[in-house]
Each structure stands twice: as C-alpha cells, then as structure tokens.
Amino acid sequence: MPTLDTRAPATVGASAPPFVHPQRTRINLALFAIGMATFAMLFSTQALLPDIAAAYAVSPDQASWTVSATTVGLALAVLPLSTLSERFGRARLMTVSVTTAAGLALLLPLAPDLSSLIALRALQGAAIAGIPASAVAYLSEELDAGATVGAVGLFIAGNSVGGMSGRVLTGWVAEGAGWRAALAAVAVLAVVAALVYRLLLPRARFFTPASLRPRRVLASVAGHLRRPLLLRLYAIGLLLMAAFSAVYTVIGFRLVAEPFGLSAGLAGSVFVIYLVGTASSALSGPLLDRLGRRGALYAAICTAVAGLLLTLTASLGAVLVGLVLITGGFFFGHAVASGSVSRVATHGRAHASALYQVAYYLGASLGGTAGAAVYHRADWSGLVAFALLALVTTGLITLYATARARARSAALEPGLAA
C-alpha cells in the first residue's frame, strides 16, 4: 500500500530532536501493528469471494463489491481525513480510525444479507482511510530524518504482512468453520493489533494544530489536476491497480474450479505471493537509478504482461509463477509511479499524494468489480484480456510521456525526463 505524506510546514517540527531508543522502538512497533491491522481489514473478504457468492447465491461481480465498496470508501475519505489530521492530530485520527474500523469488523460476520455486508464494508473503508492519511506525517514529526526512513519501512512491512495474513487466515478458517468465522478471526486480529498500537504509541510531542482552510485545499487540488504529468501518473496508478485488483479478486474463483479444484484454504494460500511485492518495492530504488523512471515502468509493465500470459495455461505451477510476475511487476510499477508524484509536485505534496491514493483505490474498486463481471461472462481468458488492456494502456501513457519529454525543452519541466 502506498503511504501518504501529509506533512505541512505549519505542523512539522523541523528542529525536533530524535526520540531516545525505547520511544523510537515503541513507535516502530505501534506503526507496524496499525499497518498490519489496516490491510488485514481492507482486503478481508477477497479470499472469501467464492464462499460469499455461494452463500448469497450471487454472481462473482456482485460478491466483489464486498472488496470494492471498501476501497471506494477509502478513496473518497482519504483527502478529507488528511486535512482533518492537520487540525486534530495524526495520532488522535489514527486511534479513532483503527478503533472504528475494528468495531465495524466485529459486525461483519453478523451481516444478514449482501447489501448489509457491502454497506458495512464501505463504512469500514472510510474509517481505515484515516490511517494512511496520517501515519507518515506522524513519523516525520516525531522522529529525526534517519529514524523516519526505517519507521516508514516498518509501517509498509506491516501493510504487506497484514494484507497477506488476512487473506491466508480467512481462507483456512473458512475451510474449517465457514466464511463468517473467517471474518470474525480477522476482526479479532484487528482488535488485538489496535490494542497493541494504542498501548505502545507515545503521546505526540511535536504536533502543532493548523487551522482548517478548505479554500486552500481546493486550490491545491485544482492546481495538481491541471498538471498533465501528474494526471498521467494518477492514470498509471489507477490502471496498474485495476489490473492487479482484477487478477487477485478473481483468482480464488479460478483456483477452486476445474481444472485445479483447490480447497478454499489452499486457494487462499496463494496470497502468500503478495509478499513478493515487499521485495520488488525494496528493489525499486536501485533499479530506478539504473533504468530511469520510464524505463522502470516499461520493465514493470512487461513483467506483469508476461505473468498474465502464463496464467492462461492449465498448469498450476505456471499460474503460480505468473502470479509472482504479476505481483512483482505491479508493486515495482506502483513504487515508481507513487514515488514520482512527490518528486513532480512542486507544492502541496500532501494533496498530490492524496490524489494518487484516490486514483489508486478507485482503480482497485474498478478492477475488482469490472474484472469479476468480465470473468463471470467470459471466463479467465476474458479477465486476462481485461487486465492486458489496462496494462497496454499504461504502456501507451508511458510512451506518450516519453515522447513529450523528448519533444519539450528540459527548461519547461526540469528534471522530469528519465
């Protein structure tokens, strides 16, 4: 998951001293815990979609709304909540967010019908949004620059572990006790992680409240939306996530069906591959230095395309290798695109990053639901065609950006040609 930089001059203690070691350790562990809770809850129904579809007698695309509604809620709430964090405090907003989201998680197993489940998931997504809207800004304010880098890395690691463990846990619990029990297990995990976060996190020392200025926020957002290069990066983030979300939303349906016929637990276990994203994100820096931004995007797209083509075979081994390539390519491309947003934005970087997150999670919603609809009507080959269309479009946008960079003077957009 991308993290959101919401630092603002009015609230950052530029000369803030670093914490002593015990406090820094507590902060690191607290942010790891809340990062794990965030992604465990966010995608808790993804591995359960075949069971949910069967339980409510609905199509895959209808069941997929239990994932898409959550990411839509997050996308719509992240920008307003990042603004509220400037006024009311990062730690306070994260506490309210994780408490509310965990409380809603406890209600999910009790949902009497699909509409109720989708509504609860949308509310949960909006609650979760306060965490990525505040986490990096909190770390930037409370720790010195050197310690912040490691702390952000642990927060992202928590995201990866939570995203993987939530999916794998639900798959195995559902196989033995049903999908409602699986959601209850994730809720317990989220509550425990929320308690760990709350007990460990020290009181913020360097936060200074800023006044809410909606006009300034709107002006900053409008300015970013008028920049073609930022719009291209937002489109790339949306399309990459649409392809990735489509694959992982539907893969469970394919693996439990013939010719594979895996159990729910085994099908859910493929989400361990999600951890490949941690490695590819970590390698993005050195590869970016060698390939340049656009070269890195081409490499990411080609890797994901190769993975998609491998999944067309009837060999389980080839499908798993394909998923590894898709996952690695997606996370690499996402790391490049999201990192470029902060580099390109000359002002209001918090809002520029927030807009990227909006596009990213809208892509998750679009890809999950549209991909499931395509799969329902055209089987896996149709899903692959859908994801390929998204990736090819991403490549064309990157190609257009390359042509623009070569055609225009470097003085007009300094430092952006890769």
Language-model region placement:
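Cytoplasmic helix-loop-helix junction between adjacent transmembrane helices
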Residues: 120-160
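Juxtamembrane intracellular "pre-TM" segments in multi-pass secondary transporters
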Residues: 13-22, 202-234
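Helix-loop-helix hairpin linking two adjacent transmembrane segments in secondary transporters
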Residues: 116, 145-147, 153-201
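Conserved MFS/SLC helix-loop-helix module at the cytosolic interface between two early adjacent transmembrane helices
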Residues: 76-114
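Helix-breaking motifs and short loop linkers at transmembrane-helix boundaries and internal kinks
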Residues: 57, 89, 110-116, 144, ...
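Helix-to-loop junctions at the C-terminal end of transmembrane segments
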Residues: 77-90, 280-293, 375
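C-terminal transmembrane helical hairpin of 12-TM major facilitator-type secondary transporters
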Residues: 294-337
